[in-house]
């Protein structure tokens, strides 16, 4: 629960007020013409939404501005678009993806999956065909929802080929 100032947190893994705030910012960026949003999942502090590292956000914002002004097609922030379930696995496709997805480590801790009971379990995630995720956990026979990096602060493992982090997401079938 977000009791403290919105930009501060206790570093609790299950605390997701920043994730909700990022989601609302993304929705606004899709509704307002000539705006965009970058993901800062690759930098930040566990207890403060404003990263001390200003260079990384500046570089991401520069790429976004270039794409908006010069109508370039590079991927700045890939966002989860569609989710479908097949044979006990969830598949996620992405919007704004003009290059391949890359898992920077084999660690898939930022991924969680649930069934209809809404109990989330750590999940295995694999990039397939360079543009889709396959997410599963053998304990979840009929998956219906997935989270990626859905917390205030934590490790980001999913990037585009050019090194831009994929936006955290929470999707249901």
Q: What name fits each language-model region?
A:
Residues 7-41, 54:
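Substrate-gating cap/lid alpha-helix
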Residues 31-34, 43, 63, 67-71, ...:
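Short, well-ordered loop/turn and helix-capping segments at boundaries between secondary-structure elements
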Residues 98-173:
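C-terminal beta-sandwich/jelly-roll accessory domains of carbohydrate-active enzymes
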């Amino acid at each position: 629960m977000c009791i403290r100032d919105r930009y501060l947190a206790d570093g609790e893994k299950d605390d997701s007020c920043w994730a909700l705030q990022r989601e609302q910012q993304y929705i606004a960026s899709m509704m307002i013409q000539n705006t965009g949003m970058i993901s800062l999942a690759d930098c930040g502090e566990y207890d403060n939404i404003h990263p001390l590292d200003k260079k990384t956000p500046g570089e991401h914002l520069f790429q976004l501005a270039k794409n908006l002004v010069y109508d370039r097609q590079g991927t700045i922030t890939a966002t989860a678009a569609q989710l479908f379930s097949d044979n006990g696995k969830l598949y996620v496709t992405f919007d704004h993806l003009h290059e391949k997805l890359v898992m920077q480590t084999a660690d898939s801790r930022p991924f969680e999956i649930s069934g209809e009971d809404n109990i989330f379990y750590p999940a295995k995630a694999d990039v397939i065909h360079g543009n889709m995720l396959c997410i599963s956990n053998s304990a979840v026979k009929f998956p219906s929802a997935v989270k990626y990096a859905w917390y205030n602060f934590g490790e980001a493992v999913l990037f585009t080929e050019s090194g831009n982090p994929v936006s955290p997401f929470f999707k249901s079938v």
